[in-house]
Amino acid sequence: MVMMKKMKGSQSFRQRLLLSTLSSTPISIDEIRADETIPGLRPHEVNLLRLLEIVTDDAVVDINETGTRLKYKPGTIVGGKNLVHSCSLSRSIGYYLEPLLLLGLFGKKPLSIRLKGITNDPRDASVDTFRSTTLNIIKRFGVPAEDLELKIEARGVAPNGGGEVLLTVPNIKTLSAVHWVEEGMVKKIRGTTFSTRVTSDFEHSMRFAARGIFNNLLPDVHIFQDHRAGAQAGKSPGYGISLAAETTTGCFISADTTVSCERPDETGELDVEKKERSPAEDTGVEVASWLLQEIEKGGVVDSTHQGLLFLLCALSEQDVSKVRVGTLSPYAVETLRNIKEFLGVKFAIKPDPLTGTVILKCTGSGLINLSRKLS
């Protein structure tokens, strides 16, 4: 019988649930935003619990009346085909994709799930970044490429969403350990601009501005357009850009953002601070510059993917993984703490003063998918 882990506070909520499920460790979390004006779990957190109930069997979720206390007993990860889930509109689909990817790998059956909601927002990684970068990082750990896919069937920006994606994830027996420390040189940049319920002129402006930043540095730059209309454009107007640099050693570094064009008077409940919208050219320049900053930081992944990289290393076979990253992000540091707490895996961390990067080594926990159906 595994003892229930007792925790406090709302931090790392998504990761705690993910690691609790993968390690079959029941958890109780107290004092969830107990002192805030609106206490308890947020809509997207309750929604994530519902999603876990869809992809697992026999999970037990117990939330008190105020939402400030949660008991979670994880079930068996089953996966399954033709699943559908409507995500909360308080976070984008990107919030749900990272845990789903990892859970899907260790399921009883391959996972095929349709997620509905917001596909692109400034807070979470966009669905474009998942396609261009996240999936490529996961393939590095021995996951077969042919069964790992994310299709964007409709776009949806805040506040009303209306987007739809189809995620398919294969089952694996175990993740391979990696020795991944060479960043290589950037050989090409690929990107996507999109627009929904607004003129495609926004896309032209972003592409032109972003290319202007890269053209002096690299000849191989292609930014594709994805203008959506009708049902495929979701329920709110907006536009955005996602960029990914690929290096000579197969690293992918990404940056993206989204601008929602919904007028303040059309939405009663948006508590986001309203600010003057900058021109689309500025958005293109901003994301291109951000991508260059991420490349300059060094490391085999960008700062938004450090946490995922460490999770993959910690979940892999009982062999040594060695990776290089830029300056550790706060989320990455928190991830290392959660990994130690749930999986008992400790990373040796060694700064490399010559490059300003950090090299991390760990022995994987050797998580094996025992429930996988052998074909």
From Swiss-Prot:
Keyword Nucleus: yes
Paired cysteines (S-S): none
Alphabetized Gene3D superfamilies for the sequence: RNA 3'-terminal phosphate cyclase domain, RNA 3'-terminal phosphate cyclase, insert domain
Main location: nucleus
Subcellular location: Nucleus, Nucleolus
Single Gene Ontology BP annotation: RNA processing
Entries under CDD domains matching the protein: RNA_Cyclase_Class_I
Single GO term (MF): catalytic activity
Keywords, in A-Z order: Nucleus, Ribosome biogenesis
Pfam families, A to Z: RTC (PF01137), RTC_insert (PF05189)
Any single GO CC term annotated in Swiss-Prot or TrEMBL for this entry: nucleolus
PANTHER family: RNA 3' TERMINAL PHOSPHATE CYCLASE (PTHR11096), RNA 3'-TERMINAL PHOSPHATE CYCLASE-LIKE PROTEIN (PTHR11096:SF1)
Membership in a protein family: Belongs to the RNA 3'-terminal cyclase family. Type 2 subfamily.
Task performed by this protein: Does not have cyclase activity. Plays a role in 40S-ribosomal-subunit biogenesis in the early pre-rRNA processing steps at sites A0, A1 and A2 that are required for proper maturation of the 18S RNA.
Protein name from the UniProt record: Probable RNA 3'-terminal phosphate cyclase-like protein
High-level lineage: Eukaryota, Viridiplantae, Streptophyta, Embryophyta, Tracheophyta
